[in-house]
Amino acid sequence: MKYFYAINILFFLTVNIGISQTQSEKKKIIGTYNKEEVSSLQSFIDRVSNERNLRVENFLTQNPSVDRNKVIEGQSYQIFDVLDGEPIYRTVDNVNSAIATRTNFLHNGGGLGLNLEGQNMNVGVWEEHHARNTHVEFSNGTFPPASRVTLADYNSGSSEFSDHATHVSGTLIARGADAFAKGMAPQASLVCYDWNNDSNEVEAEIQTNALLISNQSYGVPIYNSQGGQNAPTWMMGCYNIDAQLWDAIAYTYPYYLQVLSAGNDGQSTYTGGVASGFDKLTGDKNAKNNLVVANAANPSVSSEGDLLSLAINSSSSQGPSDDGRVKPDIAGDGTSVYSSTSGSNTSYGTFTGTSMASPNVAGSLLLLQQYYNSLHGQFMKAATLKGLVCHTADDDSSKPGPDPFFGWGLLNSKRAAEVIQEDTSGGSLISELVLNQGEMYTKSFTTTGGSPLQVTICWTDPPGGNQSGSLNSTVPALVNDLDVRLKDPGGFIIHMPWKLLIFNINSPAIKGDNVVDNIERIDVDAPVAGTYTIEVTHKGTLLNSSQDFSLIVTASDFSLSNDEFLSKNFKVWPNPVKDQLYYSFKSVSQGDVNIEITDINGRLVYKNT
């Protein structure tokens, strides 16, 4: 038998991240959409939106003294819905941020040599108002300058710029005219909408432009800034119709990931929650398929990218969801973030909140999509991206495993990018798979042990049942319950995934059968050397008879056991390459082996048989 191996290598002198969200890439993603599911989703969005608008209009008609919009202590509030007869308002919930999440290692001149800055990539932002698109940070660096920010629904007669929208957008894509304000993806483009009709507009952007990532730094707070309770008690932690709606969008469009702020109610207290000091997430922040971001308080990181200290900002809203799911999902740095503001084309400001942590994460994830596409010619599904960043996040060492403060930990863009690179040479595994009804998926791999071993599965789950009005309902929102198990080399020890204890949420996470989360991660801190076997199964009947899922595996000297994946035994170093390239290959075949090494632009740089 003859084996052929084509290996992509990064060369410092020739690297050029040119593959990104081109029209052909957009068409490829758009071509995967199911027209019947799209039509059903659009009807659902319209129904929810129309019913909500009718409730608001009827309330305003019956209460003419109440304003739809108001400003309290400089913060804007707008009636979002009317529940239990009361108006529900919503409100808005960076060099240092890039360092904290190690995103700077991906930039031009960063320690990984990747030169990823969002070239030809696009991100969506929904905000209370619009970003000042003429700000110097949003120019494309040409003369005459052109803005990289498109104001999609801006009306010069009635729309306005806001500091919040301009600051969030700067955290995402500021080019670094002021070096201290450089954003996560400083060469990316951004489309900005106000928050009215957000679900309709997101769906349209996905349909038209294959939107991969959106940032939404707003939500329904527990209290307004005058101290009055804004949200009904049942709403905190509840999988309500808003969570259901955004899960429906994600399930219909599996490449789209909604990134949003957890909220700033960390110090708020109320009566009737799951536990004192917890259960403060509202609306779509309780969805399953999005990425909800907590606010870390200026994490300390070494020059090599190692985390030195980690603490949560006390204002960051705590989870979990009422059914015990891990929420928030991950943490970013949103404390004292310096970025652009709307006062002028050269104004800046320092803000704190999960509103700032969310774009820190969203912009970083855009670069990870860019990198993966440059190596594979396609983007990751949202479940793969979410699973990857939760797999590689830095854990809060005071509480091993996930928790309702940080989620899975602080985003580590550097480690996530390294796993993407290792996957191409067999040092780790990132795989997008399908589990059919009644099947068991198995995969074996070997490791030399010593350093931690991790296995993660993540999937975009169908929307669950609407629990609106139910206080602290523990009914799982999970529809397709997949399970991952890991057998040790002797087959006698079965390692289980993490899970939270909803009835004792103050206690650390434990390991066991997880029946609520659509991400499951197994950690083995001190694995023995040998061959391990991953098993993925499901409970009950799978909706639609199958479930796509993503698998991420990292371990010391990792290698797959199957001949089918023999190319994973091909090792190349260093990568990126400066002067000399080395490779080794341990063959289990007596057949011929053809080796071709190309750079990421497709140029052949080495060939041998």
Give short role names for the model-derived ranges.
Residues G349, P402, D481-L551:
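Noncatalytic accessory or regulatory domains flanking protease catalytic cores in secreted, cell-surface
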Residues T14, G409-N480, L551-L560:
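Secreted peptidase-domain scaffold signal
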Residues Q21-E25, V92-S214, Y223-Q226, T252-L257, ...:
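Subtilisin-like serine protease catalytic core
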